[in-house]
Curated annotation (Swiss-Prot):
Subcellular location as annotated: Cytoplasm
Signal peptide limits: none
Lineage of the organism: Bacteria, Pseudomonadati, Pseudomonadota, Alphaproteobacteria, Rhodobacterales
Gene Ontology annotations for the cellular component aspect, listed alphabetically: cytoplasm
Residues binding ATP: 242
The encoding gene: gltX2
Stated name of the protein: Glutamate--tRNA ligase 2
């Protein structure tokens, strides 16, 4: 049987690190097994779903290289959901309810005050036909799925054996009074129709899974296998949900995080395997195993992405960055030497721009007060550009002879005057790249 997985984001916002884990795991399972990966946009929320978010989701996945085999939109399948709803009505598994949100809230509070679980009391099932007709005229009705009150069990790919008593769960609302088909229902119909065989999603969906198993069975479908991964927390264990707006993929991308650095962290975070940098998707897939992930909340710190990014970019061959370097305006004959000098001194590729500005426009000199006279004298001994591989040795030898300085007292002030930095690349490699020197004699 072909493995079919899906990633089903709602286009009500951009992808963040939390749902990236879901996307990556489902993609990896499909790719590793030679199966099919579906991108399904769960866009039935007409008010909140935006085309810009749909486009953004696809752009982010393409940036990461998480390509899909099929694209589906729930908004194209509304007629199918209506058919499935009729099927459930005929089977006696779909019933209309009329309570207002306020009335439901009062019921919940009453049950909680009595020390009972806030499970819907199925009062709507006791209404007569006349009462239903009267209520329909007063307010719109919404629809619930009638759960069989038995234990719902499955073996989870991460959590292990799961058993949930359906009597402890409210009959789920599947269609709102305004006609909007809700996630629990549309997703169940889609997963059956699209032949989905394996679903990985967050641990906050476990109860949803229990109800969806019954919905799928009521529609004559075979539920897929499920695995529920842990939820992410902040670095100190705090809830991450309020911070997800600052952890969208496009925000991390804007900060210079590389796709493979992000995927490498997410492919191992929360698993029994150590995080390591993968340079290709093939390397990542070779070491991926959903069974190595645990149930405990997983700490995520965005700062962990930057050592991985630095390691990744510093290992790139020149050909991989040739276009970016050319776009900076680096002359062709200096492009490869520039990369060789700059690569070990950058954290993200965007740092290259700062290095080329330094080389092409000159650095603001950093001169300690006690070195001012020394630098003025030294600069009189430095000829104008261009410089060659021997220029640094020749310059420092001349300054040493003229001033008597040597060692750190000679080299450090000169480096700071020419580059504005106390540390950096070997000056013998820097000099041939310097187009301008701003320190004056």
């Amino acid at each position: 049987m072909t493995t079919v997985t899906r990633f089903a984001p709602s286009p009500t916002g951009y992808i963040h690190v939390g749902n990236l884990r879901t996307a990556l795991m489902n993609w990896a399972i499909a790719r590793k097994s030679g199966g099919t990966f579906i991108l399904r946009l769960d866009d039935t929320d007409r008010e909140r779903s935006k085309q810009e978010y749909s486009d953004g989701i696809m752009e982010d996945l393409e940036w990461l290289g998480l390509t899909w085999d099929r694209l589906e939109r729930q908004s194209d399948r509304l007629d199918r959901y209506a058919e499935a709803a009729d099927e459930l009505r005929r089977a006696g598994r779909f019933y209309e309810c009329f309570e207002s949100p306020t009335e439901l809230d009062l019921k919940r509070k009453k049950l909680l005050n009595m020390g009972k679980p806030p499970v819907y009391d199925r009062a709507a099932l006791k209404l007569s036909d006349e009462e239903r007709a009267r209520l329909r005229e007063e307010r719109g009705g919404y629809w619930r799925f009638l759960l069989d009150q038995e234990r719902i069990e499955w073996t989870d790919g991460i959590l292990g054996p799961i058993s949930i008593d359906a009597a402890s769960v409210s009959d789920p609302v599947l269609i709102r009074a305004d006609g909007q088909v809700l996630y629990t229902f549309a997703s169940s119909v889609d997963d059956i129709d699209m032949g989905v065989t394996f679903i990985v999603r967050g641990g906050d969906h476990v109860t949803n899974t229990a109800t969806q198993i019954q919905i799928m069975q009521a529609l004559g479908g075979t539920p897929p296998s499920f695995a529920h991964h842990s939820l992410l927390t902040g670095a100190q264990g705090e809830a991450l949900s309020k911070r997800l707006g600052t952890l969208s993929l496009r925000d991390l991308r804007a900060r210079g995080v590389e796709p493979m650095a992000l995927l490498s962290l997410m492919a191992r975070l929360g698993s029994s395997q150590p995080v390591e940098l993968f340079r290709t998707h093939e390397e990542l897939l070779a070491g991926f195993d959903v069974g190595t992930f645990g149930a405990a909340p997983t700490k995520f710190d965005a700062e962990d992405l930057f050592p991985l990014t630095r390691h990744y970019v510093q290992g790139l061959p020149f050909e991989a960055v040739r276009g970016r370097i050319a776009a900076l305006g680096v002359p062709d004959d200096l492009a490869e030497p520039f990369w060789r000098v700059a690569k070990d001194n950058i954290g993200v590729l965007e740092d290259l721009g700062g290095w080329w500005t330094l080389f092409s426009e000159g650095a603001e000199p950093q001169i300690d007060p006690e070195d001012e006279d020394f630098i003025r004298q030294a600069m009189t001994l430095l000829p104008p550009p261009p410089y060659g591989p021997e220029s640094w040795a020749q310059f420092t030898a001349a300054v040493k002879e003229a001033t008597g300085r040597k060692g750190k007292g000679l080299f450090m002030p000169l480096r700071k005057a020419l580059t504005g930095q106390a540390h950096g690349p070997d000056m013998s490699e820097v000099m041939p790249l310097l187009q301008k020197v701003r320190a004056k004699g």
